[in-house]
Amino acid sequence: MDSAKLIFINQINDCKDGQKLRFLGCVQSYKNGILRLIDGSSSVTCDVTVVLPDVSIQKHEWLNIVGRKRQDGIVDVLLIRSAVGINLPRYRQMVSERQKCD
């Protein structure tokens, strides 16, 4: 199994189509299996229909997403987890440090 690349939402457009990604985002909207996540001024649309039966989504909730980027820029979600209580500054620092090592 291929590992997911840990990124920020604003880096999704720079990733290859089909690439497996992992990122954190705040729920801006959710309707009919389509999720809009934001982080600062960046946003991404995610299709959660594959995991839909197992998903409970609340507006403004922070979510940890693993999915594949489609050609149209939407991310097909493979795994979704709540990130309630996450220390955002520490998380951002950890992602930046990890990216420097990759």
Curated annotation (Swiss-Prot):
InterPro entries: NA-bd_OB-fold, Ten1_fungal. It is found in: Nucleus; Chromosome, Telomere. Pfam families: Ten1. Keywords: Chromosome, Nucleus, Telomere. One of its GO terms (biological process) is telomere capping. Transmembrane segments: none annotated. One of its GO terms (cellular component) is CST complex. One of its GO terms (molecular function) is single-stranded telomeric DNA binding. Interacts with stn1. Required for telomere maintenance. This is Protein ten1. It comes from Schizosaccharomyces pombe (strain 972 / ATCC 24843). The gene is ten1.
